Structure formats: C-alpha cells, structure tokens
C-alpha cells in the first residue's frame, strides 16, 4: 500500500462520520502492532513520532521504520511527526520520509502562531506533505494547564495558514490514565461551525471514553491521538512476562509477549472511532 498523507485519510471522515487514530509510537514492537491492528480492522492508521520517541530514537531511523511499515501494509499508513517544535524539525521529518507533520505553536500569541504555522504549511505543501497545527494549549493530566481554543479565532487561523487539520483544546488532556476528560461538546460545535470542512483533532484520546469518541467522530473530529492506553497495555504485558519467570533475560522473547496485547488495545482504539 502506498504511503498515505494526512489529507487522504482525514478528508473522507468528514462525510462518513468516522475518525482515524493517531497512535503514539515508542519503538518497533508497538509500531508493528499498530499496523497489524489497522490491517485486522481494515482501517487507515497514523503512526506518530512525538518528542519522547524522538529523544530515544533519531528521526532518520523512525522515518525508515515508518516507511517500511507503510509500504508493506495492506491499509493506508500515515507517517506523522507529532508536536514539532519548529520548522527545522518539520523539514527534517519530511527529508526522512514523513508524509505529515504537526507544528505546535499553541503556546505562542495568535499572531506568532499563525505566522510560524504558515511558514511550516508553505514549506510542507511544496513537498506534498500534510500539516496539523494546534490552537489553544492542550494541557497535561499531571501538570501544565490547558488554555482552551477560542472558536472566534478558528476561521482566521485556518484561512491564514491553510492547515489540513487543527488540534483543539476543549477539556482534553495529555497523559490521562483513565477516561473522564470533561469534553466541551458545545465548544466543538462552535469550532466546527466557524470552520466547516476543517478536520479537527483531539489529543489526549485515552482520556475520552470510547462511546464519547464514537459520538465525537460524527462531528468534525476526524483524528484522535491515543498513547497512554497503549503504553499501559505494553507495560502490563511486559510485567506479566517477567513475573511468570523472573530469570528470563532474552529481550526478543520478552518483547514478543507484548505484541498481541498491544495489538488488541490498538484494535479497540480503532473500533472506538467508527
């Protein structure tokens, strides 16, 4: 299957009432499990390399891994840079084969966010690469607060940047270990009304209950980022493997026991968005 772009997998969601998952990758084992899950569900998938992943594994290595998985998959696979800090990391990702980049200027003023996002979007478009941006800070369950997305700013932001997708702050939080995020559905409706046709993204998808994901997928929310649920599945499987035989030490044998549980968790995430 040819590597897919962000536009190719998100645009159909606006009309068919579904969403695509952006799954946070930390290594080969989970990336492979995510693709197998997508193939089993016959759905597209977005493989995401966030700051933590990039601190552990260089982008050229991640790019090669994502490209290999995409080119050998039977479903569309998007290689996505998550939370790019500046235009330089976005350009490096493109040079490494990524088909989608996110520039996160949410902590900046509106004017600076528009200006820098526009620069990234202009650069990425010249390579046929999709761009996600963020308007309004999405906070963390264990720290930084959210600022919320102002619906009154959305139309101008989209008009002036031309991004392919917009991450919004509506009560969602990164790193929630259980569902229950206080999602402001009225604000989502206001944002969608301000920019009809713009695919919206919710980071912190693990904090959003599966039934609510299904409901939100029938709006303009076309992408849910999910990581914590999958890391929890990986950690539980690895602990169980070690506890069964504390003397085990073979890395490949141990990690192989995480693949089925992570695949199952990824399949559940994919099913929750349609």
Where are these regions (language model features)?
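Cofactor-binding active-site loop characterized by glycine-rich and histidine/acidic residues
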Residues: 56
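Conserved oxyanion/phosphate-binding beta-strand-loop segments in alpha/beta enzyme cores
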Residues: 1
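Generic enzyme active-site microenvironment
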Residues: 80, 132-134, 201, 269
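C-terminal alpha-helical cap/extension of soluble enzyme domains
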Residues: 209-274
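Histidine-centered catalytic micro-motifs
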Residues: 23-25, 79-84, 199-207, 212, ...
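An acidic- and aromatic-residue-enriched active-site/binding cleft used to recognize and process polar
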Residues: 136, 205, 229
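Alpha/beta enzyme core
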Residues: 4-16, 26-52, 60-74, 84-196, ...
């Amino acid at each position: 299957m040819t590597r897919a772009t962000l536009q190719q997998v998100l645009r159909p969601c606006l009309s068919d009432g579904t969403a695509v998952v952006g799954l946070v990758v930390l290594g080969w084992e989970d990336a492979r499990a995510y693709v197998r899950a997508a193939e089993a569900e016959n759905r597209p998938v977005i493989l995401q390399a966030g700051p933590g992943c990039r601190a552990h594994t260089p982008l050229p290595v991640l790019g090669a891994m994502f490209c290999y998985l995409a080119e050998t998959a039977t479903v569309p696979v998007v290689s996505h840079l998550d939370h790019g800090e500046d235009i330089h990391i976005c350009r490096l990702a493109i040079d490494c084969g990524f088909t989608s980049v996110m520039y996160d200027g949410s902590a900046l003023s509106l004017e600076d966010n528009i200006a820098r996002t526009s620069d990234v979007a202009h650069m990425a478009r010249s390579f046929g690469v999709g761009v996600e941006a963020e308007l309004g800070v999405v906070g963390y369950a264990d720290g930084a607060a959210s600022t919320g997305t102002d619906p009154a700013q959305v139309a101008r932001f989209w008009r002036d940047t031309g991004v392919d997708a917009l991450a919004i702050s509506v009560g969602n939080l990164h790193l929630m270990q259980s569902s229950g995020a206080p999602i402001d559905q009225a604000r989502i409706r206001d944002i969608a009304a301000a920019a009809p046709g713009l695919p919206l993204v919710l980071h912190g998808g693990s904090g959003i209950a599966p039934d609510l994901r299904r409901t939100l997928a029938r709006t303009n929310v076309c992408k849910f980022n999910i990581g914590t649920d999958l890391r929890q599945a990986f950690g539980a499987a690895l602990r169980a493997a070690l506890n069964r035989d504390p003397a085990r030490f073979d890395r490949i044998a141990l990690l192989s026991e995480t693949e089925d549980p992570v695949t199952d968790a990824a399949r559940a995430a994919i099913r929750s968005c349609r």
